[in-house]
């Protein structure tokens, strides 16, 4: 009966394509809400156009057309002057999920997954049933007009119609109809998105034609930014799974050459160093649960305990000192008992660093006796977890330097030359094997050893900032502020080896800030790799970093000020909070390197703003005083004229000049 039920259940078992998954979960692609869905469409098509133009070395000219066809029904067209798309790639670009030119590259880019354009087609198809119309040419004299639909079950694009005509034009135009969308020029729609992306791409010209008219976001820089270089993964950001993935894809014939060619900061010299680390870990792995491991620990433990005996001699008895020294002489047989004393001294050291002299004296008698169960004693003092951590740290320090560790255990006769040679051969065999034969345990050991070594931070050639000067030009063009200050911080790393950089700017006065019921208030513009983040502001670490600043210190009334704060995070990997990619995960406790960089940059800009506001207030105060004095200049001149017996007008003229 049970077997029959199992057969029945699995009759409904089916495989599903990634396109089918997103058809049922379109909100994960940003298609949730009428305005947000239309903004997502514009975002995907515009960023694709920008990326194509920049990769081809072309200054982007982008046209966006939004036409209302009916209630919640719009036609959208995005046209660029980019390199065009070869005919054979059109079905893959627009009709296949997870197909693209970015996901496999370790480089800063606006998008990576290869979902965006295909997601636009999928949304058009499930809301109107209509294909996307693609007009494109690579400049070879042939202009293709193609209609593409998606076979959702197969996750493949299909050309349903094709026309070819001759003409001199190069670029791509995408047209589509969409329902369940809405448009306005509010702060969370396509207009605001284009307004902000024009700030982050000052070298692009974007023309928007919508139901309200035409708006031109002109370029303010006539030079393309330098292309970011593709980077290699850094050892500190490497995982076992990633190393095995690299091993499957590499063209290298040996693991050692793969590490040099595929990873950043790994050289042939560092491979020799890696051999010692792997040798250390292999020895420890083989003997960690044996008497050998206890003997290894004892080599170092006796030195530590001697230092503790001298340090805490006022808190332990002479008999205890003698007992400990006898135990050391009788190693390794007495190691288990000696460990109990070692744990006591580690705990004492921890307490001495934490407690006051008075509290230590109260515990003095407690120190002078060894309880039956020392861990129980520590637990009563709420220190068991900390004590174990301290002990683990000491064990790690014991084997921190692999060369010293190997030399020490060899000198003490804990390992023979034959045994050591056997381990060395095993390490060399791992590094000399074909990468495709690498096992999980071997890859895990390599990753752990690499992350125990010291490496320079990864190169930052894969990052491409907008540049402080360009940000200031864009903000001046868009907001006409009274004051603007931008800064691009030097690149740093987070999570051990992922490079990132932060750019921030403050614009004050003019059209800065957002209009509220009681005047202009602070406006926060968030960007990730130059792409505007319009939604989920309260959940975003960039917002939290801005709000953590005490703006009153810089002469503002908190957030009730006409100020626009610009924050752009650039990285080869942006730590988004979710698949929607609208909020960045960073705070005081998570990816704090990013959070702190934003704060530091904002404080630098804030100090410049404070100087500006102080000068303005000082000038205003001086002007007020001058006007006050000028008010009485005539009276003063009349009195002085009587004394000097000179014309009043002549005296007044000189007084005014003096005041000016």
Curated annotation (Swiss-Prot):
The keyword Isomerase applies. The gene is top6B. One of its GO terms (biological process) is DNA topological change. Signal peptide: none annotated. Homodimer. Heterotetramer of two Top6A and two Top6B chains. It comes from Methanocaldococcus jannaschii (strain ATCC 43067 / DSM 2661 / JAL-1 / JCM 10045 / NBRC 100440). It holds the Pfam family Topo-VIb_trans. Its EC number is 5.6.2.2. It catalyses: ATP-dependent breakage, passage and rejoining of double-stranded DNA. Belongs to the TOP6B family. InterPro entries: HATPase_C_sf (IPR036890), Ribosomal_Su5_D2-typ_SF (IPR020568), Ribsml_uS5_D2-typ_fold_subgr (IPR014721), TopoVI_B (IPR005734), TopoVI_B_transducer (IPR015320). Keywords: ATP-binding, DNA-binding, Isomerase, Nucleotide-binding, Topoisomerase. It comes from the Archaea. One of its GO terms (molecular function) is DNA binding. Transmembrane segments: none annotated. This is Type 2 DNA topoisomerase 6 subunit B. ATP binds at residues 48, 80, 101-102, 111-118, 581.
């Amino acid at each position: 009966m049970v077997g029959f039920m199992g057969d029945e259940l699995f009759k409904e078992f089916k495989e599903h394509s990634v396109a089918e998954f997103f058809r049922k979960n379109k909100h994960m692609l940003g298609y949730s809400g009428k305005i947000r869905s239309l903004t997502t469409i514009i975002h995907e098509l515009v960023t694709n156009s920008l990326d194509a133009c920049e990769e081809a070395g072309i200054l982007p000219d982008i046209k966006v057309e939004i036409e209302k066809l009916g209630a919640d029904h719009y036609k959208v067209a995005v046209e660029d002057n980019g390199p065009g798309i070869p005919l054979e790639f059109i079905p893959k670009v627009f009709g296949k999920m997870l197909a693209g030119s970015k996901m496999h590259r370790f480089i800063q880019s606006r998008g990576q997954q290869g979902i965006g354009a295909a997601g636009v087609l999928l949304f058009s198809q499930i809301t109107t049933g209509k294909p996307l119309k693609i007009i494109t040419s690579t400049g070879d004299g042939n202009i293709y007009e193609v209609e593409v639909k998606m076979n959702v079950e197969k996750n493949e694009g299909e050309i349903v119609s094709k026309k070819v005509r001759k003409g001199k034009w190069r670029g791509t135009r995408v047209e589509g109809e969409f329902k369940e969308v809405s448009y306005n020029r509010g702060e969370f729609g396509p207009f605001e998105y284009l307004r902000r992306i024009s700030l982050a791409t000052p070298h692009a010209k974007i023309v928007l034609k919508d139901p309200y008219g035409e708006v031109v976001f002109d370029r303010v820089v006539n030079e393309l930014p330098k292309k970011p270089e593709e980077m290699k993964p850094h050892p500190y950001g490497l995982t076992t799974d990633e190393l095995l993935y690299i091993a499957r894809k590499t063209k290298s014939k040996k693991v050692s050459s793969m590490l040099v060619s595929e990873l950043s900061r790994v050289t042939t010299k560092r491979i020799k160093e890696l051999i010692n680390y792997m040798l250390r870990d292999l020895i420890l792995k083989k003997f960690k649960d044996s008497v050998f491991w206890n003997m290894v620990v004892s080599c170092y433990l006796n030195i530590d305990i001697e230092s503790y005996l001298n340090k805490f001699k006022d808190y332990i008895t002479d008999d205890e000192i003698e007992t400990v020294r006898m135990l050391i002489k009788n190693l390794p047989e007495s190691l288990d008992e000696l460990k109990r004393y070692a744990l006591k001294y580690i705990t004492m050291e921890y307490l001495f660093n934490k407690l006051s002299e008075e509290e230590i004296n109260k515990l003095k008698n407690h120190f002078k006796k060894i309880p039956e169960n020392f861990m129980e004693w520590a637990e009563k003092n709420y220190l068991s977890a900390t004590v174990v951590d301290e002990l683990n740290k000491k064990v790690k320090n014991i084997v921190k330097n692999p060369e010293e560790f190997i030399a020490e255990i060899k000198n003490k006769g804990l390992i023979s030359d034959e045994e050591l040679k056997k381990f060395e051969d095993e390490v060399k065999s791992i590094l000399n094997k074909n990468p495709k034969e690498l096992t999980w345990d071997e890859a895990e050991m390599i990753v752990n050893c690499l992350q125990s070594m010291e490496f320079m931070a990864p190169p930052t050639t894969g990052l491409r900032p907008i540049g402080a000067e360009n940000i200031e030009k864009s903000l001046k063009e868009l907001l006409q502020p009274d004051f603007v200050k931008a800064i691009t911080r030097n690149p740093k790393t987070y999570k051990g080896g992922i490079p990132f950089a932060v750019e921030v700017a403050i614009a004050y006065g003019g059209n800065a800030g957002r209009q509220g019921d009681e005047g202009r208030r602070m406006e926060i513009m968030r960007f990730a790799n130059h792409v505007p983040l319009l939604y989920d502001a309260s959940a975003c670490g960039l917002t939290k970093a801005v709000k953590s600043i005490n703006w009153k210190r810089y002469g503002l009334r908190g957030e009730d000020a006409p100020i626009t704060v610009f924050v752009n995070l650039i990285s080869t990997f942006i730590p988004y909070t979710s698949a929607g990619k609208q909020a960045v995960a960073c705070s005081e406790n998570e990816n704090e390197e990013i959070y702190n960089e934003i704060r530091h940059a904002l404080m630098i800009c804030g100090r410049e703003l404070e100087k500006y506001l102080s000068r303005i207030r000082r000038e205003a105060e001086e002007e007020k005083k001058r006007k006050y004095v000028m008010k009485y200049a005539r009276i003063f001149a009349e009195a002085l004229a009587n004394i000097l017996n000179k014309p009043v007008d002549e005296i007044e003229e000189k007084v005014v000049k003096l005041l000016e």
